[in-house]
């Protein structure tokens, strides 16, 4: 079951916004959930907020003894076959912020038929797909994934995340 909801916390001033956002996120977590969270985004304009938010979520999961798997931001993109580059070999250029987000959103629509106006929700959808596939593999459930069928880029991400 997939439910989509963009969480934002209360207000626009920290630490209240960050604290209430962490509370909102944790309110949706159940003890036996299989969780994938995005790794730290080191190349962000809002590093202080992102770092605080990421640590806050991890601390809350730790206090509740809830295991999680961390997915690096580039692995999240790789899972939907977005490299962050466009163009032909020898003439490539790096995608910038909004271009990269749009490329990820377009890839998710193409691969899964899923779309949402928020890139945060789309990223969460990808994390849910990674968690589902990782759970399938770890649980030994009969699946094409356990038979070696699937996209190479996705297997590479799953191998990296499961450790």
Regions found by a protein language model. Give the residues of each.
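Phosphate- and other anionic-substrate recognition elements at nucleic-acid/protein interfaces
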Residues: 1-163
């Amino acid at each position: 079951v997939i439910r989509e909801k963009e969480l934002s916390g209360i207000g626009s001033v920290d630490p209240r916004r960050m604290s209430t956002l962490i509370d909102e996120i944790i309110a949706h977590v159940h003890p036996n959930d299989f969780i994938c969270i995005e790794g730290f985004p080191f190349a962000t304009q809002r590093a202080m907020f992102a770092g605080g938010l990421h640590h806050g979520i991890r601390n809350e999961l730790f206090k509740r003894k809830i295991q999680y798997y961390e997915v690096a931001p580039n692995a999240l993109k790789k899972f939907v076959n977005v490299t962050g580059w466009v163009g032909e070999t020898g003439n490539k250029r790096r995608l910038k912020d909004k271009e990269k987000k749009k490329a990820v959103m377009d890839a998710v629509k193409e691969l899964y038929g899923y779309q949402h106006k928020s890139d945060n929700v789309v990223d969460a959808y990808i994390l849910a797909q990674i968690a589902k596939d990782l759970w399938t593999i770890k649980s030994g459930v009969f699946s094409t994934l356990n038979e070696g069928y699937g996209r190479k880029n996705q297997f590479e991400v799953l191998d990296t995340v499961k450790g």
